[in-house]
Regions:
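Conserved catalytic core of nucleotide-sugar-dependent glycosyltransferases
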Residues: 127-193
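Secondary-structure boundary elements
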Residues: 38-42, 101-109, 114-116, 181-187, ...
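Conserved glycosyltransferase catalytic-site signature
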Residues: 29-30, 89, 93, 175, ...
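Charged, glycine/proline-rich intrinsically disordered loops and linkers
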Residues: 57-65, 145-161, 200-215
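A glycosyltransferase accessory/donor-loop signature
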Residues: 10-12, 119, 165-168, 174, ...
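N-terminal anchoring/stem segment of glycosyltransferases
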Residues: 3-87, 101-106, 300-326
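GT-A fold catalytic core of metal-dependent nucleotide-sugar glycosyltransferases
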Residues: 90-145
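A structural signal for short, well-ordered beta-strand segments and their strand-loop junctions
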Residues: 46-48, 109-114, 119, 136, ...
Length: 326
């Protein structure tokens, strides 16, 4: 009988993960790291932060330019202090470029996750995914046709700044996750450049992610996400995309779960109060608390038991009390 080697064993792709956070978003970083570790990720999570390192990151080892926290066998979080005045949402492409240039130049692929995401699938799925193209998840605002007036305005902005549109896209992708192979990493520089051009033109304030003056003002460049989607139009790099189910924006997702605006972050949510107001615990809420203790212990056991009680009661209340859809 011929021996067929395990694909996980022969896979030699070198990958890393990164995120950025400040304030209480460290809770999300902990749950994200736990969920990735639980599903087989072994390697380095680079965490750019503003403020202080998390209270749960004990026994930090200081290295050249970062502090390392051991997560478990073969896995660590490396905290990189950020001094940028930019809103961290706008800093995503900068941080990824900085990592590739100064911290992990030899990796084959780099993944960014927002710190309010919880992973749901095995890590080898991501490595296979990014080998097929730039990995992306559809946004809740998914269908944005090539002839949509907002997309045409984005295109005009790019052309007025010397860019050429390489392809037409009909779908809109969430900037809370991206996986980039080293062959396509210049997409990050384009994303970064577009944001900076937007600020120069007065269409963005890079210290204010959701400037209310931009969403309804031509050319409708709103937050970092619009600039990412525009950057995708300006290259012909292959894309490998999933729909909004990829982040649990619609039922049936199996990849990750994302607590986006306007939802309250799981670590802040009063689950019983929310359920009494017609909002029962979400999939993301449940996953967050499921991955809040191992291998990183984010809370006391008393807190965890109370949250399990709130999830149980909140889910039961949700069968009888439900907010009417918009």
């Amino acid at each position: 009988m011929n021996y067929v080697p395990n694909k996980k064993i022969i896979n030699t792709m070198q990958t890393a993960i990164c995120t950025v956070f400040e304030k209480d978003y460290h809770y999300g970083v902990g749950a994200l790291a736990n969920s990735l570790y639980h599903h087989g990720f072994r390697g380095i999570v680079w965490a750019g932060y503003r403020g202080n390192t998390p209270h749960w990151a004990k026994f930090l080892k200081t290295e050249n330019g970062y502090q390392e926290f051991s997560l478990g066998e073969g896995c660590a979080i490396r905290f990189v202090k950020l001094t940028t005045p930019k809103h961290l949402g706008f800093y995503k492409p900068d941080f990824m470029c900085q990592l590739w240039e100064n911290y992990c130049p030899d990796i084959d692929a780099l993944f960014y996750f927002d710190p309010d995401i919880v992973n749901k699938c095995e890590w080898d799925f991501y490595e296979n995914w990014v080998s097929r193209g730039i990995a992306l998840c559809g946004d809740s605002w998914y269908l944005v046709p090539a002839n949509h007036p907002r997309r045409l305005a984005w295109k005009e902005f790019a052309q007025n700044n010397g860019f050429v549109c390489e392809r037409e896209l009909d779908y809109h992708y969430n900037s809370g996750f991206i996986g980039v192979h080293k062959n396509y990493k210049s997409i990050l520089e384009i994303w970064q450049k577009l944001e900076e051009l937007g600020e120069i033109a007065g269409y963005a304030n890079l210290q204010d992610l959701y400037n209310n003056n931009t969403f309804n003002r031509y050319p409708y460049l709103y937050g970092d996400q619009t600039y990412l989607n525009l950057a995708l139009m300006l290259t012909n790099y292959p894309l490998s995309t999933v729909g909004p189910d990829g982040m649990d924006f619609v039922p049936g997702g199996t990849i990750m779960s994302h607590a986006t605006v306007p939802h309250i972050k799981p670590w802040r949510k009063k689950l019983l109060f929310s359920a009494l107001n017609g909002n029962s615990p979400t999939i993301t809420d449940k996953l967050y608390w499921r991955h809040s203790q191992t291998p990183i212990q984010l809370y006391s056991m008393a807190k965890i038991l109370w949250q399990k009680f709130e999830i149980l009661c909140g889910s039961a209340l949700g069968r009888f009390i439900r907010r009417a859809p918009m």
